[in-house]
Amino acid sequence: LVIDKLAAMNEVILEKQYFRQWWIIILFGGIDAIILYGLLTQLITGTPWGDKPLSDIGVIILYICFTLFALFFMNMGLQTRIDDHGIHFKFIPFSRRFTTYLWSEISKCEVREYSPVKEYGGWGIRYGRNGMAYNVSGNQGIDIILKNGKRVLIGTKKNIEIQLFLSKIESINKPI
C-alpha cells in the first residue's frame, strides 16, 4: 500500500551542480591568463618569461595542461535524482552509475544546514565524523541515515523543494 502511494506521487526532483563559484572561475581564469601572457610573450617577442624560463615547448605544455585541468575541474559535478524509489546520486566523473538508497533502506532523511569545512573538511567527495559527504557548493544538504547505520550527506541547492518532497514521503509512510 505504501509503495503504491509513493508510485502515485509520480514526482521527480532532478538537480545538477558544478564547481562554478565566481571565485573558482576568477582563480582559474586569472592563472590561465597569466600563463597565456607568458606563453605569448615568449613566443611572439622571443623574450624569456620569468627568471628561470621554460623552453617554448615547456610553456606550451604548461598552458595546455593547466587549461585541461581547469576544464576538468569545472566539469566535475554532482547529479541528484529523488523519486518514488529513493535517492540516487553520482559525482561526475568519478561515478559512472548512480548510487541509490531506496526508501526502504533509509531510517531517517532530512534537509539541514551544515558546515562543509568544519564537518567534512571542504567540498567534493569527503569523509567526516558524520560519514560521507558529496557536495559541490553551499551549506545545505540531504542528511541520510540508513538502517544499517551508515550516514551520507548530499549537498543541494533545492533544499525547500526537497524538504517538501520529504514531507510528502513522511506523510505517506505514517500508519493510518
Map each language-model feature to its residues.
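A short, polar/proline- and glycine-enriched secondary-structure boundary/capping micro-motif
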Residues: 23-26, 98-101, 155, 163-167
